[in-house]
Each structure stands twice: as structure tokens, then as C-alpha cells.
UniProtKB/Swiss-Prot annotation:
One of its GO terms (molecular function) is structural constituent of ribosome. It comes from the Bacteria. GO terms for biological process: translation. GO terms for cellular component: cytoplasm; ribonucleoprotein complex; ribosome. This is Small ribosomal subunit protein bS6. The lineage of its organism: Bacteria, Bacillati, Bacillota, Bacilli, Lactobacillales. The gene is rpsF. Belongs to the bacterial ribosomal protein bS6 family.
Length: 98
């Protein structure tokens, strides 16, 4: 399978402490790396207001990860664990054009 570029955007709940947020980001970056992905960039985008409440929150911190991988294993594991995390309100995985 050929190497493809992906962008993952996820929203972190706004009331999380800064230390817990950086642990969360590190944990999910490690999940991607441990499953064969190469992370090119992982950064906070900004805290933004939502158009509608998500899990009773009206704003959240957006985090963006750019990565490359040649298998779906890293993406599937990220997707599975992000669904269970109460600290991640929403997430989206997008395949970028080569």
C-alpha cells in the first residue's frame, strides 16, 4: 500500500487543565506513531465557539495533526479510542490530495 497524507482535526473540551490537555495530545500522538504513522505536525489551532452546543459545551480547543501512513491501522486505532474519550468532543480524519 502506498504512503498517504492525512489530517486529523479533533476538538478538546474547554474545561480541561493545560497539563491534562498536553497529556491527552501526547497520548493520541503516541497512538498514531505506535501504529505506523509518521507525524509531520501536531498543534493547537485555537479555541472557538460552536454553532450549536456539543455535549453541553459551547466552545472547544481545536487540535490539528498532519501525518503520513501506509496502512489504516493507525487511523482505525485513533478513531476507536477517540470515540471512547470524554475529553475529545468530536474528531474528523481527512485524506489529503497527493
Amino acid at each position: 500500500m502506498e504512503t498517504r497524507k492525512y489530517e486529523i482535526t479533533y476538538i478538546i473540551r474547554p474545561d480541561i487543565e493545560e497539563s491534562a490537555k498536553s497529556e491527552l495530545v501526547d497520548r493520541f500522538d503516541k497512538i498514531l506513531a505506535d501504529n505506523g504513522a509518521t507525524i509531520a505536525d501536531s498543534k493547537d489551532w485555537s479555541t472557538r465557539r460552536f454553532a450549536y452546543p456539543i455535549a453541553k459545551y459551547t466552545e472547544g480547543t481545536y487540535h490539528v495533526v498532519n501525518l503520513t501512513t501506509d496502512s489504516d491501522q493507525a487511523l482505525n486505532e485513533f478513531d476507536r479510542l477517540a470515540k471512547f474519550s470524554d475529553d475529545i468532543l468530536r474528531h474528523m480524519i481527512v485524506k489529503l490530495d497527493a
